[in-house]
Amino acid sequence: MIIGYLRVSTEKQHPANQQDEIRRFAESKQLIVNHWVTEVASGKKSERDRKLGVLLRRLKRDDTLIVTEISRLSRTLTDIMAIMGKCLERGINLYTTKEGYSFDNTINSKVLCFAFGLVAEIE
């Protein structure tokens, strides 16, 4: 399953731009987004307290989660690292469209995740 995750911080913001960007990204990778999850929530809220937490618990090995920016997952590096770690451990692919990050089961992804982890430790 391929999921596009859209998060805005306030009701006044619209997720349409995020959805368009994810759709274009998916098409460029010859992927079809099967499901969209949209929520209005602060990125400072824990993923457990948002739809994202439910989504992460339901994803299975080889599923793909696409976000426009890593900050859509969380605003804190520690939370981002935890989310990325869960995805890597469970074999869930994670793509960010703007930064161009691709977290999958490759050695490059693991090295990048490790580097993010070091930064989180320093903070």
Positions of predicted regions on the chain:
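Short, structured surface patches at the beginning of a domain
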Residues: 1-123
